[in-house]
């Protein structure tokens, strides 16, 4: 008769994640591709439990935020994924974004899901219940305005300018528009000859100061 058969019993779903640093941070001004990885994982018990033979499929879903989350990319296959060298059963992937997924002022929710190679149809990760990654896509520069000193003002020894004041606002503003916010404001001061470098007008090169 036939000899013994060895097989792996695997009912554990794989896991997937996004690896773009800017997506994890939450604010993006350029996103030509979304990158990530999926791993066929072994169950935690019993000790020494095995896993099936890697990843068979990875999908991504992107939603945009209006009054509520609205799916703009239904679950769709990513491209360029395969098992990494060394038999790690970790597959990397990339997804090329399109115009509706990169509109400045929009907030997006990115989710991934994967399927492993267990027979007959693979264990599927439940992507719908994942928290995902929320990002704000912002390519508009902020607006700023100097409050004091006033434009074309004339100031002398009896009215010295010791403090500069200004406002900065992330742009555009409005209902349903999301922005990254102001990270920092810088100023440069020029006396028609040199730039202020912190202790005098000593720099012929442009100097921006925090």
Predicted features and spans:
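Low-complexity, disordered linker/stalk regions enriched in Pro/Thr/Ser/Gly
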Residues: 1-210
């Amino acid at each position: 008769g036939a000899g013994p058969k060895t097989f792996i019993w695997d009912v554990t779903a794989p896991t997937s994640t996004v690896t773009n640093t800017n997506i994890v941070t939450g604010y993006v001004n350029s996103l030509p591709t979304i990158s990530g990885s999926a791993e066929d994982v072994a169950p935690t018990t019993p000790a020494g439990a095995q896993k099936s033979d890697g990843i068979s499929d990875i999908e991504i879903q992107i939603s945009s935020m209006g009054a509520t989350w609205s799916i703009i990319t239904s679950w769709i296959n990513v491209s360029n994924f395969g098992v990494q060298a060394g038999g790690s059963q970790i597959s990397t992937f990339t997804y090329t974004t399109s115009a509706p997924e990169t509109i400045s002022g929009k907030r997006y929710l990115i989710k991934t899901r994967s399927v492993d190679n267990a027979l007959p149809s693979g264990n599927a990760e439940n992507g719908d219940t994942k928290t995902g990654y929320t990002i704000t896509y912002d390519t508009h520069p902020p607006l700023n305005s100097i409050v004091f000193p006033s434009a074309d003002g004339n100031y002398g020894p009896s009215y010295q300018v010791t403090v500069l004041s200004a406002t900065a606002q992330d742009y555009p503003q409005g209902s349903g528009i999301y922005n990254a916010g102001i990270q920092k404001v810088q100023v440069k001061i020029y006396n028609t000859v040199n730039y202020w470098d912190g202790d005098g007008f000593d720099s012929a090169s442009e100097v921006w100061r925090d």
